[in-house]
């Protein structure tokens, strides 16, 4: 048991050379932020100076210092950045005039501005809003300094945005007539290629640089005419996770040039070939494999493998990482593949080159047969590494190999997927998708495995007997979730992921749909309504309000279950309609009450009784419109006709689905056997007739 420390002990500790602070002497200072104020202020001043300088975390590149921005200039540019952020311009011309005035003030200071933390945001906004000539002017001002800017913490982001906009200008240039192109002194294509000449001597440094590697990846995408992902998406190729969060916080949004590909001239393919050559030449297999599992370089090598086939039929980079397809098993390659299958960076690299289509199918099949086929289950149990490779293989191998993987995984699916431990949830989704792609291969086994895991007490043949909500608890973990919290907690990422998984199950088979209905009925009504008002779980409720198609048919027991679920909503329609999340559920109730006009009238009557409250709410007005409540109030017959049309469409869809229904594999196989038997019987009949004729003769 530790003894309490006295004041003198604290004084001695705080007075030691490494811990000495002003708090060890003088009067006691109140508050946690008061101590070390001078030290923090000095550190802040040092950071400001460092922010102005070129950051080079992993490069030996000697970069210039472009100078500090004056305090008065910072205030002006900060004000200009705020003005652009608000976008309170009456016209595009007014905004262009404002940008021109800012660029005039920034003339000759561009390099100093883009390497400043505050002013770099202004430059990025100007590039997003700027016109063609303004972009070209900024691009020219960066000439001979592109390498330095690519290696800087702040200017690298500005450069990425500029490159995306310049790619759009290159496409515009290609669409112009020959006369318009002749009037232009220097083409944007020429400017881009000139910039590439600056980068070539430094390509190998950029591969492993914290900031320049992102610029290099963007250059490769542009040269290959590939889609340039949005800088705000979760899996963006352009930005790191921290950068995407920062852009959202400072409200910098992409324009129409992002999240699309651009047409490029033939000369860009030559430049892409040079980039691939710079990366592959003079490198040994050991060096390339080290880059493949390098935290920063790995995404670059993934991208090069994806695009090198456009300009290099020999696939030089691929064959510096893996042996040719003609080679048999190799101990060194086996050790490298094992590292890829067990390392977080390596598994991400391996998954990417399998999924993104850069490698030829025969290359992937060779690696699979040599090093993975015999231990699929072992890899599937590696929930943070190998399982992602197994998932990727399900959609890239030949059908017979996909079925082999499914045969290995499906019997153990209930043991592999764990919501509580946050393991292999994506594997469950991938198995379902792979089964569907193979004409619902072993569908019943998958359903059985997942039901036994998440709803062990549910009987699909007699769903009404279910008196618990195991399925909801086991998939959404409601007891430990933010459901019912009064602290306005935001839904967590885990809750979103679990909800999406449950929605996947609801779409897969009606057994899960009925299990969720009975779970809703087993819950206390208050708890169920909390789900309806929850930012994530409300989507599950909305998704569960699906009627079994008429082609399958709704049994009497299922019809009763649907009515019981609708009864739960009675008395809460108005509060749901006026809520941001609940309003979507009320909208969905219109289709969920098909063939049940009585429930439609009950819910409409509830909204009519509190029409003022519903109409005063933004969400309530939308529900009022979607339910055609004005017709309900003034033209009840017309409202009833809408219901009649809905019921007829439901029956018609069922009839069409019955006539156009895709036959199941077992049905096709039975038809083939029937035709085969018919043919054999016909042949035997013909043979008998021939024998009879021969006897007669």
Swiss-Prot record:
Query: GO biological process: any one?
Result: post-transcriptional regulation of gene expression
Q: What is the role of the protein in this entry? A: RNA-binding nucleolar protein required for pre-rRNA processing. Involved in production of 18S rRNA and assembly of small ribosomal subunit.
* Name listed for the protein in its UniProt record: Nucleolar protein 9
Keyword terms: Nucleus, Repeat, Ribosome biogenesis, rRNA processing
InterPro entries reported for this sequence: ARM-like, ARM-type_fold, NOP9, PUM-HD, Pumilio_RNA-bd_rpt
GO CC entries: 90S preribosome; nucleolus; preribosome, small subunit precursor; small-subunit processome
The UniProt entry annotates Pumilio repeats at 105-140, 141-176, 198-234, 283-319, 332-369, 371-407, 523-557, 567-605
Tell me where on the tree of life, at the top rank, the source sits.
Eukaryota
SMART domains per UniProt: Pumilio
């Amino acid at each position: 048991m530790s003894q309490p420390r006295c004041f003198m002990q604290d004084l001695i500790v705080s007075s030691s050379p490494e811990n000495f602070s002003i708090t060890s002497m003088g009067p006691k200072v109140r508050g946690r932020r008061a101590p070390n104020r001078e030290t923090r202020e000095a550190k802040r001043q040092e950071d400001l100076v460092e922010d102005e300088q070129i950051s080079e975390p992993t490069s030996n590149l000697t970069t210039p210092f472009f100078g500090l921005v004056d305090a008065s200039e910072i205030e002006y540019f900060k004000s200009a950045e705020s003005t652009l952020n608000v976008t309170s311009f009456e016209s595009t011309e007014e905004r262009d005039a404002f940008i021109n005035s800012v660029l005039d003030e920034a003339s000759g200071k561009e390099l100093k501005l883009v390497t400043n933390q505050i002013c770099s945001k202004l430059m990025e906004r100007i590039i997003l809003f700027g016109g063609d000539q303004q972009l070209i002017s900024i691009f020219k001002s960066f000439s001979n300094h592109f390498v330095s800017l690519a290696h800087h913490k702040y200017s690298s982001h500005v450069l990425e945005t500029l490159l995306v906009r310049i790619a759009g200008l290159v496409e515009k240039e290609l669409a112009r007539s020959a006369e318009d192109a002749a009037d232009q002194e220097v083409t944007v294509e020429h400017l881009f290629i000139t910039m590439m000449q600056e980068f070539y001597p430094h390509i190998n440094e950029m591969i492993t640089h914290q900031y320049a590697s992102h610029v290099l990846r963007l250059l490769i995408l542009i040269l290959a005419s590939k889609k340039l992902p949005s800088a705000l998406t979760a899996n963006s190729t352009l930005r790191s996770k921290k950068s995407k969060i920062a852009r959202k916080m400072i409200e910098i949004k992409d324009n129409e040039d992002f999240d699309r590909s651009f047409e490029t001239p033939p000369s860009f393919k030559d430049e892409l070939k040079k980039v691939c050559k710079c990366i592959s030449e003079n490198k040994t297999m050991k060096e390339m494999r080290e880059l493949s599992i390098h935290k920063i370089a790995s995404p670059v090598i993934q991208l090069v493998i994806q695009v090198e086939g456009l300009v290099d039929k020999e696939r030089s980079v691929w064959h510096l990482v893996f042996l040719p397809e003609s080679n048999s098993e190799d101990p060194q390659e086996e050790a490298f593949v094992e590292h890829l299958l067990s390392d977080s960076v390596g598994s991400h690299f391996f998954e990417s080159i399998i999924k993104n289509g850069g490698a030829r199918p025969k290359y992937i099949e060779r690696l699979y047969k040599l090093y993975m086929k015999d231990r699929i289950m072992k890899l599937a149990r590696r929930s943070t590494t190998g399982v992602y490779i197994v998932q990727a293989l399900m959609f890239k191998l030949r059908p017979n190999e996909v079925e082999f993987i499914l045969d290995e995984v499906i019997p153990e699916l209930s043991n592999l997927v764990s919501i509580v431990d946050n393991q292999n949830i994506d594997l469950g989704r991938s198995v379902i998708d792979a089964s569907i792609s193979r004409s619902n291969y072993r569908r019943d086994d998958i359903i059985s495995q997942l039901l036994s895991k998440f709803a062990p007490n549910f009987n699909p043949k007699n769903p009404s007997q279910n008196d618990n909500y195991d399925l909801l608890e086991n998939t959404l973990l409601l007891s430990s979730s933010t459901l019912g919290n009064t602290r306005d907690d935001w839904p967590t990422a885990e809750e979103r992921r679990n909800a999406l998984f449950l929605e996947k199950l609801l779409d897969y088979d009606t057994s899960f749909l009925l299990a969720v209905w009975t779970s809703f009925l087993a819950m206390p009504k208050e708890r169920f309504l909390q789900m309806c008002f929850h930012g994530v779980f409300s989507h599950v409720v909305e998704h569960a309000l699906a009627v079994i198609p008429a082609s399958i048919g709704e049994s009497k027991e299922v019809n009763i279950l649907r009515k019981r679920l609708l009864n739960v909503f009675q008395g809460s329609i108005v509060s749901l309609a006026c809520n941001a999340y609940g309003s979507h559920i009320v909208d969905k109730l219109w289709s969920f009450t098909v063939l049940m006009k009585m429930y439609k009238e009950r819910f409409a009557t509830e909204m009519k009784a509190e029409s003022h409250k519903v109409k005063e709410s933004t969400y309530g007005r939308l529900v009022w419109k979607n339910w055609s409540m004005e017709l309900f109030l003034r033209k009840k017959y017309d409202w009833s006709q809408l219901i009649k049309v809905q019921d007829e469409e439901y029956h018609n869809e069922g009839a069409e689905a019955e006539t156009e229904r895709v036959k199941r594999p077992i049905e096709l196989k039975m038809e083939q056997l029937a035709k085969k038997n018919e043919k054999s019987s016909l042949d035997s009949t013909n043979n008998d007739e021939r024998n009879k004729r021969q006897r007669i003769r």
